[in-house]
């Protein structure tokens, strides 16, 4: 069977599956990050960092398998970031599986509250942002950090710059850029929450759009903690992202119906919205 080529958006290869109620796992292999784990698709196993948005089974069900398979392959223990409110319960989940599986299931579990940051490396960090689902949930923004020589030191020799550094002078400015945002499951309320500005400025926004047509009302979508595509149109001017990847479509839709709904999006969304249809 021919391997399907990864989708590439704004320079980021993106892989994964997302079918509403069935499974969601979005993978950014160049960042070594997966968002949610679904049923643990094979490509997720090689990602060192896993960010969980909420504890519904279609988003967290494959968690023990993710850790167990990394152990089987003798990979380093992964780092798993979960909402702080469910950290203790996730710890209990692993204790049960250790007893069942008679294995260590080594991993690093981190509880992150909304607004808190997790440092992946010097030039990459992730912050949790507020989302609105029927249970405790949160999204994540990935930021890159670049260091630029301050204007007043441009033109100095290498030795002069080295001497300044040695003497403790801060010679660079930090340029922090929101690169990728992931919503998990949420209503459209996350769009109008003022604290979520960076999610709407990230180069790539991965957001749910569970419902696409008039057979389901906006009210129904909101009642179940989800987004109807018409709400994305209504908030179109708020999205400053270079690209938006829609995920988590209801299993009731076909690939053609999904693609038709996306291609019908008006400006300013037209041409910068993509759909993840793997598995449909």
Swiss-Prot record:
UniProt entry tagged with the keyword Transferase: no
Group of enzyme by EC: hydrolase
Xref: CDD domains: RNaseZ_MBL-fold
UniProt-recorded Gene Ontology molecular function terms: 3'-tRNA processing endoribonuclease activity; metal ion binding
Cofactor remark from the record: Besides the tightly bound Zn(2+) ion, TRZ1 requires additional Ca(2+), Mn(2+) or Mg(2+) for pre-tRNA processing, while bpNPP hydrolysis occurs without addition of metal ions but is stimulated 2- to 3-fold when free Mn(2+) or Zn(2+) ions are added.
Consequence when changing residue 140 to L: Reduced catalytic activity, but no effect on dimerization and tRNA binding
Effect of residue 62 to V: Reduced catalytic activity, but no effect on dimerization and tRNA binding
Gene disruption phenotype: No visible phenotype when grown under standard conditions.
Consequence the record notes for mutating residue 25 to G: Reduced catalytic activity, but no effect on dimerization and tRNA binding
Keywords from the named record: Calcium, Cytoplasm, Endonuclease, Hydrolase, Magnesium, Manganese, Metal-binding, Nuclease, tRNA processing, Zinc
Subunit structure: Homodimer.
Free-text note regarding domains: The C-terminus (270-280) is essential for tRNA binding and processing activity.
Protein name: tRNase Z TRZ1
Gene3D superfamilies reported for this sequence: Ribonuclease Z/Hydroxyacylglutathione hydrolase-like
Similarity field: Belongs to the RNase Z family.
Role: Zinc phosphodiesterase, which displays tRNA 3'-processing endonuclease activity. Involved in tRNA maturation, by removing a 3'-trailer from precursor tRNA. Can use bis-(p-nitophenyl) phosphate (bpNPP) as substrate. Involved in the processing of small nucleolar RNAs (snoRNAs).
Effect after changing residue 83 to L: Loss of dimerization and catalytic activity
Cofactor (UniProt): Zn(2+); Ca(2+); Mn(2+); Mg(2+)
Any single Gene Ontology cellular-component annotation: cytoplasm
Location in the cell: Cytoplasm
Effect on the protein of changing residue 59 to L: Loss of dimerization and catalytic activity
Biological process terms in GO annotation: tRNA 3'-end processing; tRNA processing
E.C. number: 3.1.26.11
UniProt-reported outcome of changing residue 133 to L: Loss of catalytic activity, but no effect on dimerization and tRNA binding
